[in-house]
Amino acid sequence: MGEQQLWERVVGGHFVLAKRSFWPNFFSRLVARLQWNPMAIDLTPDARAWPELPDDRRRRLTTLLAGFCVAEDAVAEHLTPFADAARGAKLASQESLMAWVFFLQRRDEQRHAKLFDRIGSEVLGLPGDTPAERRAAARAYATPAVLELFEERLPAMAAEIAEGRTGLDEGVSLYHMLLEGVVFDAGQHALLDDLADGALPGVREGVERVERDERWHVGFGLRCLVETKPTADLLDDLLARAGEAAEAWGDAVPAAIRHESAHKVAHRLHVAGLTATRAVA
């Protein structure tokens, strides 16, 4: 038997590789439609309105916004090993193209980090002359669970992936399915509900844009999970940890939103054909 031909045709002496999957192109085109500038959002009305909000509301919003200051920087910093792992994985889609999509996602995360740094500086009034200094100040307001997830568990997972001790399946289970798909999902929806009255219009606009980006991030992570062919044990562990992830914000996120975000994991896995049982509300 001859060797498998890896190209579908030759054009001008160049080998044209067969298109193994439409998914990388799908996500790339989606990203192109979602571009926005975090520096263009006007936070002036928000800065004026912030001191006038009731104390309880400011405390709740500070917990969420400060948590995102910490978390968005962390997810931007620790995504590169995932792209490297995608290049070396055996996927249905072209591995190098899937790695490129991780790069596109990292650009999104960097944009989100800039937005929340602006909110921390211009609205919350966090002290510090640099993003790193303001992020250090934000840690005092973030919940212990958020700090543990994004400053301990995520960096540890990224290091294990970089060293080849953990696969892409475990990485996207934590990063895309739990941190983005549950923790971020719950925090963003709590913010959008709280700010539906227009009290902080610039913050709400920014969170809306971030939330739209995160939808494709989670979808991309789910696609990666499907293509890595995860074990039943990994999926069971993912489902078991969803509830814990939803509790990361504490009382800053209403119980109904926590419950809904946690159950989205089971729904996504079912829709993707990874599990046979639909989530029970």
Question: Model-found features: residue ranges?
Answer:
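Non-heme di-metal
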Residues: 1-281
